[in-house]
């Protein structure tokens, strides 16, 4: 499991906060944002819509450590919320959270299901029933994995994989307690075609 690369985003300090001014900001090709966090004052930001949208559409912002270049000052952050236009689906506002590189953070990491070809249950026609596609973990910012792999090797129809079965990279641990050993994926039998009995007709 490889660690994620840090994504860099440029931003400027923003003084305006009124709705009309924010609308004007968007018309000029910018996106309003904010960064907040424990022990920090809230800071209003302006982002380039073109630059941010490119990163957003590439999927590089999900569960990634962000290096924010705020008017020349670097801050580390996570994207916590992206508000989209209800009709146009364009980015309207972005929330960031300050990250202290020396402390652990909570973050959702996508699960990657590997070795389907080595699962007898799937070879026999079983269906992979995914119940959980991401999981909350704790780690230091420099240990954030790109994905957490779930190994399907050897799994038969009717078998499941639970969260405690998943191996985590060094320095990464689950947020959930050990007693919450919930199921993340099962291999189920495919629905078989059943012929309906023909109704008898009287002559």
Swiss-Prot record:
Keywords in alphabetical order, please.
Answer: Ribonucleoprotein, Ribosomal protein, RNA-binding, rRNA-binding
One GO cellular-component annotation of the UniProt record comes to: cytosolic large ribosomal subunit
Q: Which Pfam families match?
A: Ribosomal_L25p, Ribosomal_TL5_C
What GO terms describe the biological role, i.e. biological process, of this protein?
Answer: translation
MF-aspect GO terms: 5S rRNA binding; structural constituent of ribosome
| Cross-referenced CDD domains | Ribosomal_L25_TL5_CTC
Q: Of which family is this protein a member?
A: Belongs to the bacterial ribosomal protein bL25 family. CTC subfamily.
Question: How is the quaternary structure described?
Answer: Part of the 50S ribosomal subunit; part of the 5S rRNA/L5/L18/L25 subcomplex. Contacts the 5S rRNA. Binds to the 5S rRNA independently of L5 and L18.
Question: What role does it play?
Answer: This is one of the proteins that binds to the 5S RNA in the ribosome where it forms part of the central protuberance.
What the entry lists under PANTHER family is as follows:
RIBOSOMAL PROTEIN L25/GLN-TRNA SYNTHETASE, ANTI-CODON-BINDING DOMAIN-CONTAINING PROTEIN, RIBOSOMAL PROTEIN L25_GLN-TRNA SYNTHETASE, ANTI-CODON-BINDING DOMAIN-CONTAINING PROTEIN
Q: What is this protein called?
A: Large ribosomal subunit protein bL25
Q: Which organism is it from?
A: Wolbachia sp. subsp. Drosophila simulans (strain wRi)
**The organism's lineage?**
Bacteria, Pseudomonadati, Pseudomonadota, Alphaproteobacteria, Rickettsiales
């Amino acid at each position: 499991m490889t660690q994620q690369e840090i994504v860099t985003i440029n931003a400027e300090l923003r003084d305006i906060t009124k709705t009309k001014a924010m609308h004007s900001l968007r018309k000029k090709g910018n996106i309003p944002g904010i960064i907040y966090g424990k022990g920090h004052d809230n800071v209003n930001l302006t982002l380039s819509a073109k630059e941010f949208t490119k990163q957003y559409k590439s999927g590089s912002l999900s569960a990634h450590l962000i290096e924010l270049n705020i008017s020349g000052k670097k801050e580390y952050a996570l994207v916590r919320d992206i508000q989209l236009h209800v009709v146009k689906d364009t980015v309207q506002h972005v929330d960031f959270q300050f990250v202290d590189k020396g402390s652990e953070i909570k973050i959702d990491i996508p699960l990657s299901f590997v070795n389907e070809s080595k699962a007898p249950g799937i070879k026999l026609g079983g269906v992979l029933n995914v119940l959980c596609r991401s999981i909350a973990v704790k780690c230091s910012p420099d240990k954030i994995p790109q994905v957490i792999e779930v190994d399907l090797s050897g799994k038969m129809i009717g078998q499941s994989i639970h969260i405690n079965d998943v191996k985590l990279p060094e320095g990464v641990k689950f947020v959930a307690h050990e007693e919450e050993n919930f199921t993340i994926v099962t291999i189920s039998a495919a629905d078989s075609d059943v012929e309906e009995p023909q109704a008898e007709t009287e002559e």
